[in-house]
Design a protein with these regions (language model features):
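PRPP/pyrophosphate-binding module of the type I phosphoribosyltransferase fold
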Residues: 103-164
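Conserved PRPP/pyrophosphate-binding segment of the phosphoribosyltransferase/PRPP-pathway fold
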Residues: 47, 51-114
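Generic non-transmembrane alpha-helix signal with a bias for helix starts/N-cap capping motifs
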Residues: 8, 81-82, 135, 160
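Active-site-facing substrate-recognition patch
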Residues: 1-68
Length: 164
């Protein structure tokens, strides 16, 4: 996982600027993990702010270029990293796929949407990491399709011990 102090601080400033980070100590939020917390980060609203969206995509692209030199595909974790992941893949001129939380029950019953070939190397983009369970599940889905994980990057990471 990538962690650049400058980019982390700038990203937090941007998220605060667009009110993506909410605080409510009196009435804690329930996260997807089931944890209760006085803080909630809604990265989905980044897509509604073109200047912020561009900056965050640039940060992610810079970090991927700096850290991973040999990869074939960008994979976004559904649903929060689909939009940003696709924009980053476009910026890097790489193919994009996304990983569903659950395999489709109809059609081709895919867990991964988009074109890929076996043994391709993948950089995974996650919108937010708290416990890391959705990131781990996404990586396991990619591995089960014979894709190789080069690394994982996120917009926001709580850096809880459980996610490391």
């Amino acid at each position: 996982m990538v962690n650049d102090e400058y980019i982390a601080k700038e990203t937090c400033k941007l998220l605060l600027q667009i009110n993506a980070i909410k605080l409510n100590p009196k009435n804690p939020f329930t996260w997807a993990s089931g944890w209760k917390s006085p803080i909630y980060c809604d990265n989905r609203i980044i897509l509604s702010f073109p200047a912020v969206r561009e900056k965050i995509c640039s940060f992610l692209s810079q970090q991927i270029k700096k850290t991973y030199d040999d990869y074939d595909v960008i994979a976004g974790v559904a649903t929060g990293a689909i939009g940003i992941g696709m924009l980053v893949a476009n910026k890097l001129n790489k193919p994009f796929v996304y990983v569903r939380a659950d395999r489709k029950k109809h059609g081709r019953k895919n867990s991964i949407e988009g074109f890929y070939e076996k043994s391709q190397k993948v950089v995974v983009i996650e919108d937010l990491i708290s416990t890391g369970s959705s990131s781990l599940e996404a990586c396991q889905s990619l591995i089960s399709e014979n894709l190789k994980i080069k690394g994982l990057i996120s917009i926001f990471n709580y850096n809880f011990e459980i996610s490391k």
